[in-house]
């Protein structure tokens, strides 16, 4: 079977498929290159496309005649033609009779027809494919064809090896020479692999190496199998016999030695990107361990690995940085050996900036970059359509740069060609085809017509106008809202044809037109400007204690057209999501709630308002702060008698600056006083000088304060005691508090114990008379105030002093003060008492001052007593009343106000001191003049008819004189312009008045005032209107139940209550009657009625009548299932009729017994029964035929009478409710129209509704006695 081997050659220079589709993609133009990219939206038909190699011919090694195939494929429009070169010469396979050529659209394939390998050898060489059309020629990579014979097994002699245990040995494989790299397998005769280890391994040369031999290594079937993948063959060598003889002596350990490679140094050359293996196979006993290191740097962990029990160092995709020195070290207990590899890495050429195919417009300058790298550096050469471009053949418009780039100036259509850039060094060659396609294309606007652009105020507006053509079209813009558009400094015409408007506003709204100059091509666009999003109230910075709840609020407003704005919260630029498990973060409208804040919650919180057009944000901070930690390390220093220095170290302020420190002390001898504040210290101080009291035992503590509160107290300082000293001060507020005559009481404020300054503290009290006693002081000691001196006469002046004393001495000398002995009551009353009447409620009182000698104390003032009895001509005697008015000590006249007009007063005056009052002066009497009266006590009204109102009132409680009559004022309330009507009532005895001729459609305001000789008094006001004739109810609604119908309606405001009836009959056949029934009279003021006793599932007709006229009718269906007529059955049998008759007879007897029992044992008073509980609203109606109506007048005639109601259809046997003829029943409410429906009381009303209010005890109140059947149900009561 023939075997072939195909190899990919020149992979770095392989030119990828150069389809025009790549040209149609928008590529980033490189510097100096004015290329054209045809957009996908540009319409063009039948565009010619330069050829491009799509399938490169491949290098191949041929081992049989069937393997020779060369293939080349290319694209282009029109389809390209192909030709070949072999070793630089033209080669036409179609002219060779040993070749067969197959050419189809876009491909060229040739293969050999030879039958022998010798014939094929003439075709060895380097082949290049050329694909051409009218736009140029593309060149393929070079493909190398090699002819090689497949490897064959050589005849060999059988090999036998002998060695002693512990020695090393290598079994040779010697694979035959071939262009293919073999794979070596050492196996036994059963094709089982020889077990490899760090002692036994296969070298890169294929040999099997033993670092040291064991007797069990002896065998006669060590076979080397050589595998060639390309030809799919395996060659098996002759088996080798290995005999390991045991040593007569104990095997001696041997230090490591290199088996492969030999010597201490080797050199390797590798190409960039290839795989390299370094190998160290060693011998020794015991088996050495092998390690690797790089002597001149670090080994790459990603590209370098170890294999074959660390005997091989493998480089994958080797790079230039891997070049250097590598050392393998073999080591056992006997020593170590080394081998050093020097690795040199070179590179075949590779692209760093490959040329790119482009389209160009005539007249443009084209720069074709072609940059490659390699070791050694490659040489750059250019060809055009496969023809070399030398320096001598360059036109003036063509030039080469030092970097290898080709520049074409002012390109024309004739410059359209395919340029080949080739980079070569000793390791290989790479080639790239690049198209220079000079083309002219008609202009087109690619942006759609009628686009609408929406922006917000202040944004930069970008209007698109994408055009394409060759040469490049020139565009301009016009606007309906901005004249001379491009002259506006905010407007910028972009190089891509777009329009940029900076800082847009509502004035920029309108239609904008993009035009291609020199043509009639244009598109329109509309610009809409919306209000920008604004944050009205940004979140505020928060400073909170741990555990509190933080609330950030972000209020904003957006344009109504910007729907569904997104409020996004961030913490330190990271999005915040609402917590559902621990409720840490909660979004509440515009608010962010952070519960139970902790140190991890500190940071910058940002609210972002995001719409589809803009985004605004505002940030704030959350700082956790707490009470400060207590100060530490308290020390008392610099003790100087009564001054010490207290030092401390501040604690942590917990993010809230210290405001101040509070120094507190505790006296160890007076712990009952607790801790007291001694001094406050500024926050920047860490020590303070403290003034102390003598004779005290101090302990100090310090508390820090910030805006979060006070810290815990610090630890206590050491105890410090101050020595005793004489008092520094005397008691304060020394005074006399003498109350009893002939006694001097000296008192003062007791001194604080800390001011005692020493032991044995007491007070020295000193006193002497101010006049007549000489300079001598009386002295006495005491331990507490007061100090009492007797026998000193009444109200005498003394000088008094109190001095502090202790065991160490006296306090400072005190200043004397004046004190007095006890007072007594004044002896005389004021004289010359006078009264001046100023008006009906005010008088002026005058008097002469009393003699100071008679006061016998400090005069504090005068007391004026006023006594009044009753008004003149008052209707009842009033009890006497006394009023006292107090004046100052220096006053001799006083105005007294708020007296009662038209009243008799007695007046007297006395002087008083701290001991009491002196005698009263002689009384003087006076009478106050008349005043205007107060308002009448009450006023109410009734309305006898639609044009009359009667007012009733009571006289004023304070007439303040003789009533002369009343004045009534009234007017319509519809407008302030209505004239005020005045009625004068001459007699004070009149207490009611009827006004006639009033407008039934108007509301009135009534004002009533009483009159005396002093004038009219205050008024009482009432609002009201007349009462209209009664009308039947309106807006009736109903709801059906199974056995009843609930009816409700609206009572007519301002109208008198009326009675109406409800007539009903069942439409379900004769079983339910088919006969009209009616309720008794229903009161329209109830607004609710329940029609009971109906049959479930039945259809009823209802008529509502008033004054024998039907004012509303309807039909209803009760809920539930109707009862169907029972078909004749056993119930018609004679025996069943007899049983029923017996039961009926028994029930009749039982009913008679019940009546007998009630007549004997249930006696009651006829009078009590007549006056007993009765539905005050329910009165039975006389028997009337259908359509008749009972008048209200007849109802009034039967008021206060009772009648027996008819028994209901569902009466229960022996039920007291049914036997008691005066119990509640289904009767209609009777109205007492004499009750004052229009009666109004003197209180504010907003309209005519109060005229129809019903008192609780009124017969019109449904809560008084609710009907039991066919009336309002009990739940309304």
UniProtKB/Swiss-Prot annotation:
Ranges of Low complexity composition bias in the record: 1255-1277
Transmembrane portions of the chain: 1136-1156
Glycosylation sites: 317, 503, 520, 531, 794, 839, 1035, 1046, 1068, 1083, 1108
Cytoplasmic side: 1157-1277
Highest rank taxon of the organism: Eukaryota
GO biological processes: axon guidance; brain development; positive regulation of axon extension
Pfam families: Bravo_FIGEY, fn3, I-set, Ig_3
Feature: compositional bias, Basic and acidic residues: 1165-1201
GO molecular function: cell-cell adhesion mediator activity
Region named Disordered: 714-740, 1163-1216, 1232-1277
N-terminal signal peptide: 1-34
Keyword Cell inner membrane: no
Chain ranges of the Ig-like C2-type domain: 51-140, 150-241, 256-344, 349-437, 443-528, 532-623
Ranges of residues in domain Fibronectin type-III: 630-725, 730-824, 829-931, 935-1030, 1032-1129
Membrane topology of this protein: Single-pass type I membrane protein
InterPro entries linked: FN3_dom (IPR003961), FN3_sf (IPR036116), Ig-like_dom (IPR007110), Ig-like_dom_sf (IPR036179), Ig-like_fold (IPR013783), Ig_I-set (IPR013098), Ig_sub (IPR003599), Ig_sub2 (IPR003598)
Function of the molecule: Neural cell adhesion molecule involved in the dynamics of cell adhesion and in the generation of transmembrane signals at tyrosine kinase receptors. During brain development, critical in multiple processes, including neuronal migration, axonal growth and fasciculation, and synaptogenesis. In the mature brain, plays a role in the dynamics of neuronal structure and function, including synaptic plasticity.
The protein, known as: Neural cell adhesion molecule L1
Taxonomic lineage of the native organism: Eukaryota, Metazoa, Chordata, Craniata, Vertebrata
């Amino acid at each position: 079977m023939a075997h072939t081997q195909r190899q990919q050659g020149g992979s770095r220079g392989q030119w990828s498929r150069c389809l025009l589709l790549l040209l149609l993609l928008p590529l980033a133009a490189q510097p100096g290159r004015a290329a054209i990219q045809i957009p996908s939206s540009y319409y063009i038909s039948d565009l010619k496309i330069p050829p491009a190699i799509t399938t490169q011919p491949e290098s191949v090694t041929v081992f049989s005649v069937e393997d020779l195939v060369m293939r080349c494929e290319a694209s282009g429009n029109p389809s390209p033609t192909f030709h070949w070169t072999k070793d630089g010469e033209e080669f036409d396979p179609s002219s060779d009779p040993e070749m067969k050529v197959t050419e189809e659209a876009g491909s060229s394939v040739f293969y050999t027809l030879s039958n022998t390998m010798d014939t094929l050898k003439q075709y060895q060489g380097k082949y290049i494919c050329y694909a051409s059309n009218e736009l140029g020629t593309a060149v393929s990579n070079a493909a190398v064809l090699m002819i090689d014979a497949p490897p064959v097994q050589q005849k060999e002699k059988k090999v036998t090896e002998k060695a002693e245990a512990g020695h090393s040995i290598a079994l040779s494989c010697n694979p035959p020479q071939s262009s293919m790299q073999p794979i070596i397998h050492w196996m036994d005769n059963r094709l089982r692999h020889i077990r490899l280890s760090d002692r036994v391994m296969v070298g890169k040369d294929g040999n099997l190496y033993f670092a040291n031999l064991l007797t069990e290594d002896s065998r006669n079937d060590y076979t080397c199998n050589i595998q060639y993948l390309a030809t799919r063959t395996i060659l098996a060598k002759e088996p080798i016999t290995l005999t390991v003889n045991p040593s007569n002596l104990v095997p001696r350990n041997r230090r490591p030695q290199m088996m492969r490679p030999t010597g201490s140094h080797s050199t390797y050359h590798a190409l960039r990107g290839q795989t390299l293996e370094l190998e160290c196979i060693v011998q020794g006993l015991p088996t050495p361990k092998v390690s690797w290191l790089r002597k001149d740097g670090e080994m790459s962990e990603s590209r370098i690995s170890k294999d074959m029990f660390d005997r091989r160092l493998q480089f994958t995709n080797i790079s230039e940085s891997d070049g250097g020195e590598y050392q393998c070290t073999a080591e056992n207990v006997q020593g170590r050996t080394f081998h050093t590899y020097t690795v040199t890495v070179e590179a075949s050429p590779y692209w760093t900036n490959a040329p790119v195919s482009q389209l160009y417009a005539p007249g443009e300058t084209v720069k074709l970059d072609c940059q490659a790298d390699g070791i050694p550096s490659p040489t750059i050469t250019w060809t055009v359509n496969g023809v070399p471009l030398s320096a001598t053949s360059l036109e003036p418009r063509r030039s080469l740069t030092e970097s290898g780039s080709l520049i074409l100036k002012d390109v024309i259509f004739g410059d359209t060609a395919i340029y080949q850039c080739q980079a070569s060094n000793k390791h290989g060659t790479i080639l790239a085809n690049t198209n220079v396609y000079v083309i002219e294309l008609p202009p087109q606007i690619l942006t759609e017509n009628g686009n609408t652009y929406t922006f917000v105020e202040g944004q930069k507006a970008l209007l698109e106008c994408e055009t394409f053509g060759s040469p490049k079209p020139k565009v301009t813009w016009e606007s309906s809202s901005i004249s001379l558009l491009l002259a506006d400094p905010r407007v910028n015409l972009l190089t891509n044809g777009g329009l940029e408007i900076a800082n847009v506003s509502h004035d920029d709204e309108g239609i904008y037109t993009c035009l291609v100059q020199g043509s009639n091509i244009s598109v329109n666009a509309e610009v809409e400007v919306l209000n920008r999003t604004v944050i009205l109230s940004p979140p505020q910075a928060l400073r909170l204690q741990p555990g509190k709840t933080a609330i950030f609020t972000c209020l904003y407003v957006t344009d109504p057209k910007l729907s569904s704005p997104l409020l996004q919260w961030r913490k330190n630029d990271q999005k915040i999501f609402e917590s559902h498990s621990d409720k840490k973060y909660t979004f509440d409208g515009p608010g962010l709630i952070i519960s139970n804040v902790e140190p991890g919650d500190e940071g910058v919180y940002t609210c972002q308002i995001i719409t589809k057009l803009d985004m605004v944000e505002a940030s704030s901070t959350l700082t956790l702060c707490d009470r400060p930690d207590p100060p530490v390390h308290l020390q008392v220093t610099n003790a100087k008698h009564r001054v010490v220095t207290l030092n401390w170290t501040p604690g942590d302020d917990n993010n809230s600056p210290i405001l101040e420190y509070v120094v507190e002390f505790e006296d160890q001898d007076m712990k009952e006083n607790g801790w007291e504040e001694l001094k406050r210290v500024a926050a920047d101080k860490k020590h303070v000088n403290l003034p102390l009291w003598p004779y005290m035992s101090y302990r100090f503590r310090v508390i820090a304060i910030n805006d979060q509160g006070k810290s815990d107290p610090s630890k206590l300082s050491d105890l410090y005691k101050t020595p005793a000293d004489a008092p520094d001060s005397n008691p304060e507020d020394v005074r006399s508090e003498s109350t009893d005559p002939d006694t001097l009481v000296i008192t003062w404020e007791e001194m604080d114990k800390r001011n005692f300054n020493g032991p044995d503290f007491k007070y020295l009290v000193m006193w002497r008379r101010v006049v007549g006693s000489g300079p001598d002081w009386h002295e006495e000691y005491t331990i507490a105030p007061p100090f009492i001196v007797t026998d000193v006469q009444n109200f005498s002046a003394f000088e008094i002093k109190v001095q502090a004393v202790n065991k160490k001495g006296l306090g400072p000398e005190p200043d004397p003060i004046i004190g007095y002995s006890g007072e007594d009551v004044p002896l005389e009353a004021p004289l010359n008492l006078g009264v001046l009447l100023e008006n009906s409620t005010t008088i002026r009182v005058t008097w002469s001052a009393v003699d100071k000698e008679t006061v016998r104390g400090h005069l504090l003032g005068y007391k004026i007593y006023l006594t009044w009895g009753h008004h003149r001509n008052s209707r009842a005697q009033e009890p006497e009343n006394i009023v006292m008015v107090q004046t100052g000590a220096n006053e001799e006249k006083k105005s007294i106000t708020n007296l009662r007009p038209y009243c008799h007063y007695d007046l007297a005056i006395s002087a008083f001191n701290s001991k009491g009052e002196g005698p009263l002066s002689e009384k003087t009497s006076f009478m106050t003049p008349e005043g205007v009266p107060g308002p009448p006590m009450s006023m109410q009204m009734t309305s006898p008819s639609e044009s009359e109102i009667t007012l009733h009132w009571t006289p004023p409680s304070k007439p303040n004189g003789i009533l002369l009559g009343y004045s009534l004022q009234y007017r319509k309330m519809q407008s302030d312009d209505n004239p005020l009507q005045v009625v004068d009532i001459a007699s004070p005895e009149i207490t009611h008045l009827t006004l006639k001729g009033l407008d039934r459609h108007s509301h009135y305001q009534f004002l009533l005032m009483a009159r005396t000789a002093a004038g009219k008094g205050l008024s009482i006001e009432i609002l009201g209107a007349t009462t209209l004739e009664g009308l039947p109810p309106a807006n009736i609604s109903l709801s059906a139940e199974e056995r009843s119908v609930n009816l409700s309606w609206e009572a007519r405001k301002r109208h008198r209550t009326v009675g109406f009836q409800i007539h009903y009959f069942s439409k379900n056949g004769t079983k339910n009657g088919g006969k009209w029934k009616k309720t008794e009279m229903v009161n329209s003021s109830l607004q609710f009625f329940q029609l009971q006793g109906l049959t479930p599932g039945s259809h009823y007709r209802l008529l509502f009548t008033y004054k024998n006229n039907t004012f509303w009718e309807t039909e209803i269906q009760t809920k539930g299932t109707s009862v169907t007529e029972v078909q004749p059955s056993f119930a018609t049998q004679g025996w069943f009729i007899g049983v029923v008759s017996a039961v009926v007879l028994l029930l009749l007897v039982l009913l008679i017994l019940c009546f007998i029992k009630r007549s004997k044992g249930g006696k009651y008073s006829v009078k009590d029964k007549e006056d007993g509980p009765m539905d005050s609203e329910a009165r039975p109606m006389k028997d009337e035929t259908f359509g008749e109506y009972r008048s209200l007048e007849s109802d009034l005639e039967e008021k206060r009478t009772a009648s027996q109601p008819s028994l209901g259809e569902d009466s229960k046997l022996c039920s007291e409710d049914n036997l008691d003829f005066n119990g509640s029943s289904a009767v209609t409410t009777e109205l007492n129209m004499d009750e004052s429906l229009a009666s109004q009381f003197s209180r504010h009303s907003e309209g005519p509704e109060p005229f129809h209010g019903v008192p609780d005890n009124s017969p019109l109140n449904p809560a008084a006695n609710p009907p039991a059947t066919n009336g309002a149900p009990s739940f309304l009561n």
